[in-house]
Regions:
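Short glycine/proline- and aromatic-enriched beta-strand/turn motifs that initiate or cap beta-hairpins
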Residues: 20-79
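Repeated loop/turn-to-beta-strand initiation elements of outer-membrane beta-barrel proteins
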Residues: 25-26, 60-65, 100-107, 128-135, ...
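Outer membrane beta-barrel transmembrane domains
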Residues: 93, 193-260, 265-269
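Detector for outer-membrane/organellar transmembrane beta-barrel domains
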Residues: 127-228
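Outer-membrane beta-barrel "beta-signal"
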Residues: 259, 273-289
């Protein structure tokens, strides 16, 4: 009997250690994607990015690492400063962290480093019943010429109506430091955003997102010399179509197409700028563990 007691105690110790094992840092997913952006009248492809992403988890903490490389692509000759050919002039490294603090509230943080700026960001996401609220607030430290800026990208209120979400979006940008006379100090942007599923099959899911600008305004230090342009009321509208296809239980491929139409109005004597458009295409894969 005396010989059995130490064995029982040792077994209990092993079980206790397993039951109360410290959490481990684990990889949850990784993926790659290619993203292109284009504005009418500029390069063939204004921005072409290759993204590499990794997700991690530790206890109830979530982490993300993103690394990207950017290229400008143009195959035509221009007289307006755009260069012909393929040229890389930027890259990005980004760290994300998120932690739920209550059943309804999650806090987030982000650091983004690029050749032209460093970003320090905090945010939150809150939901209660059918009501939603979230926001990201960040400071951009500009590398080189230009002003450091403070940004607020805020969804003060939103509602879930079944699978559809409707949110009010407010964006505020403040240029910091000494602003020269006639230069922009801050800008305001008000939008309604709508998110909705379109189709859900055994492997394929389709969804859409709409962004509709209600109004935009800008504030300057004194009067501008030549006036300025803002988006016309309801003059900027963007639609996304998003698709995801599950190749296996762990591997998904996805794609996104976005298109935005823009209409401007001049202020302080400026002529209305020409209408233009913006487009965005993303294709990639994500592997989940």
């Amino acid at each position: 009997m005396l010989k059995i007691i130490p064995l029982l105690l040792a077994a209990l110790g092993v079980v206790s250690a397993a039951a109360y094992a410290a959490p481990e840092l684990t990889v949850t997913n990784f993926g790659q994607s290619i993203e292109s952006e284009n504005v009418s009248g500029a390069n063939d492809v204004d921005d072409l990015w290759l993204w590499n992403t990794v997700g991690l988890k530790y206890d109830d903490w979530s982490f993300g690492l993103t690394a990207g490389k950017q290229w400008n692509v143009d195959f035509d000759d221009h007289d307006d400063g755009y260069k012909k050919g393929i040229e890389s002039d930027n890259s990005r490294i980004q760290f994300d962290v998120a932690k739920p603090v209550t059943e309804n509230l999650k806090l987030t943080g982000r650091y983004r480093g690029q050749q032209n700026y460093d970003r320090f960001q905090v945010g939150y996401a809150y939901n209660y019943g059918m009501f939603l609220s979230s926001g990201d607030f960040f400071y951009d430290s500009v590398n080189g010429d230009g002003h450091d800026t403070f940004h607020a990208e805020w969804f003060p209120v939103g509602v879930s109506l079944g699978p559809v979400q409707i949110k009010y979006y407010f964006e505020y940008v403040k240029n910091l430091g000494d602003i020269q006379l006639g230069k922009q100090e801050e800008s305001f942007d008000h939008q309604i955003r709508v998110y909705a599923p379109l189709y859900k099959g055994e492997r394929l899911t389709l969804s859409t997102e709409g962004r509709f600008t209600i109004m935009q305004d800008k504030e300057f230090n004194g009067k501008t010399k030549k006036g300025y342009n803002v988006y016309d009321d309801f003059g900027r509208n963007r639609l996304y179509l998003k698709a995801n296809y599950a190749l296996t239980e762990n591997l998904d491929v996805f794609g996104t197409f976005g298109y935005e139409m823009r209409k401007y109005k001049g202020k302080e004597g400026a002529n209305n700028a020409n209408d233009d458009y913006w487009s965005n295409v993303v294709v990639g894969y994500n592997y989940k563990f």
